[in-house]
A protein has these predicted regions:
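N-terminal active-site segment of His-dependent metallophosphoesterases
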Residues: 1-49, 122
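Active-site-proximal beta-strand elements of phosphoester/diester hydrolases
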Residues: 1-13, 110-120, 145-149
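Active-site neighborhood of phospho(di)ester-bond hydrolases with catalytic His/Asp-centered motifs
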Residues: 5-7, 36-42, 67-74, 117, ...
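Active-site micro-motifs of SAM-dependent methyltransferase domains
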Residues: 11, 45, 76-77, 152-153, ...
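Short, motif-level signal for alpha-helix interfacial/capping segments enriched in acidic residues
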Residues: 18-22, 159-178
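Non-catalytic positions within long, well-ordered alpha-helices that form the structural scaffold/packing
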Residues: 28-30, 137, 176
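Extended active-site neighborhood of metal-dependent phosphoesterases/phosphodiesterases
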Residues: 49-140, 144, 161-165, 170-171, ...
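Active-site clefts of carbohydrate-active enzymes
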Residues: 150-161
Length: 214
């Protein structure tokens, strides 16, 4: 099966939300058999009523015809806690923090996908780590995928920022131990695809950073 992955469709005005909506429509045209859409976060820029209205208005013709797995981005977080939880009806896991976003998982065919909240406790709480380990260890799916907003690896300005460094140190050993096949994230506003890596060496897990064009 196929799916669409994109991120950072945020815009600060109606014109740019129209453009991001057009990108999503194009993705559907290019991949008409996609079973679902995974958005790695930052739906809006300033996280206000007007921007959310623009997002849904300009994307509704796409979103009405495909299931979306949303991720909490930092623009759904910073000083605007609670917006993400109010916008999406999700099956929230034990220990989830509705103030900063949510984390959850789902299955499709032979794949198990865990959606993480990288706004949680800069960048991720012990509760969420424990949940991820239990969640992945309880799945026997052929493909195991993680979707999150902030990245462990970056080819842009975020490469040495504290949240990226902490994410790498905190999450990489966990991801490697769980035999995750691929990690998809956003945040950097560029496209990056790594070699398969493990212990910071080229090996099993692949990391893909989506830009606004998915």
């Amino acid at each position: 099966f196929s799916f669409i992955a994109l991120a950072d469709v945020q815009a600060g005005n109606e014109i740019n939300f129209t453009k991001s909506g057009a990108v999503q429509r194009t993705a559907m045209q290019v991949c008409p058999d996609a079973k679902f859409l995974m958005n790695a976060g930052d739906f809006v820029n300033d996280c206000n009523d007007q921007e959310w209205d623009w997002f849904y208005e300009k994307s509704c013709d796409t979103l009405m015809h495909i299931t979306m797995a949303p991720t909490a981005g930092n623009h759904e977080g910073n000083l605007r806690w609670g917006w993400f939880d109010n916008m999406f009806n999700l099956d929230k896991s034990a220990g989830w923090n509705h103030i900063t976003g949510v984390y959850y998982s789902f299955d499709y065919s032979n794949a198990h996908i865990a959606v993480l909240n990288t706004n949680d406790m800069y960048p991720i709480s012990e509760e969420q780590i424990n949940w991820l380990q239990n969640d992945m260890n309880s799945s026997d799916a052929q493909w195991k995928i993680i979707l999150m907003h902030r990245a462990c690896y970056s080819a842009g300005k975020n490469i040495n920022k504290p949240d990226t460094v902490i994410m790498r140190k905190r999450l990489l050993p966990i991801i490697d131990s769980l035999d995750i096949d691929v990690v998809i994230n956003g945040h950097d506003h560029m496209y990056l695809r790594t070699y398969q890596v493990k212990d910071d060496k080229i090996q099993p897990t692949e990391y893909i950073t989506e830009n606004y064009k998915g």
